[in-house]
Amino acid sequence: MKSYFRPEIDALAGYTAGEQPKIANLIKLNTNENPYPPSQAVQDALRSFDIDRLRRYPDPFADELRDIFAADANVKRENVIVGNGSDDLLTMCFRAFTSPDHPVAVFEPSYSLYPVLAAMQGAEVIKVKLDSCKFTYPADGAQQAARANMLVITRPNAPTGTLCPKDLVRQYCREFDGIVLIDEAYGDFAADNCMDLVKEFDNVIVMRTFSKSCSMAGVRLGYAVSNPIIIEGLMKLKDSYNVDMLSQIVGKANYLDKEYRAKCIDAIKRDRDDLSNALQNIGFEIPESHANFLFAAPPDGDGESCFRYLRENAVLVRYFKGDITGRYIRITIGTPEENARVLELLNARYA
């Protein structure tokens, strides 16, 4: 059959999302979801919701959420755009700033969706390599990315969990003559963030998601903060009603319960560090994680074998093929009971 697709789409491999298994009694630690439920405020908001409202369209701009996010970032509503998950906002940015004549630069390894979005635009991807052992960032990163129109920094990085020092991020923003997109999907698990750089530099976009620290991966909600001119341009690219009514309502309820969210984050960070120390004691190589997961190389350096062993024992983690990433598995931090089971299995195999 004749193909009606653009050549870029025909050649596209597509993004491989983390497996969402239907198997009962499987410990699922492969997609960096929060092990704890959303705030009770979400259930209360759903109980009080008037279902008759669903016959109406939602606020196309999610202005109530924009005001809440703006207040937290100490900016104005005009500095904020809300999306159907941060992937929606990433898609807008790639549509806005990349093309066959406008390359994008990404650090390698990082989020595997970026090259897919670039390919959809027919854009070249300039890969700036991280150190292959500790996954540290090069001081000349902006120079390596100089031909690009957009530089993407995942902070903390996925899948490694490492953190580009804020002073180095600031240096990149100052030296790079293009858009600097800082993807802070895991930012709440780190010691600091880059939201204030939006006011320091006109070329910076900082992006957040509700899928990790907010326990709402199933809702699909995210937001980005930048200067008003960039936000105005991105507004032209969004779907007309890109954030549904229920997402806006439960997103607000959940986000405002900051005390509960902070307790969940603290528990995850504590368990992350405990599991990291325990695995290193039996020979795992783990770069310091600032996220809600560990990037862990087993003592024999065979990440795929370790992944399969855990899967055979009803624990699902993530494995990424590759010369560097293939040595590792990525383990989402789960409940204390789930983490204990992971440690029990890995102790049995490697200790």
Where do the language-model regions lie?
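Active-site phosphate-binding strand-loop segment of PLP-dependent enzymes
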Residues: I126, L130-D188
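PLP-dependent aminotransferase class I/II
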Residues: N203-Q280, F284-P287
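Conserved PLP-binding catalytic core of the aspartate aminotransferase-like
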Residues: K269, N281-N313
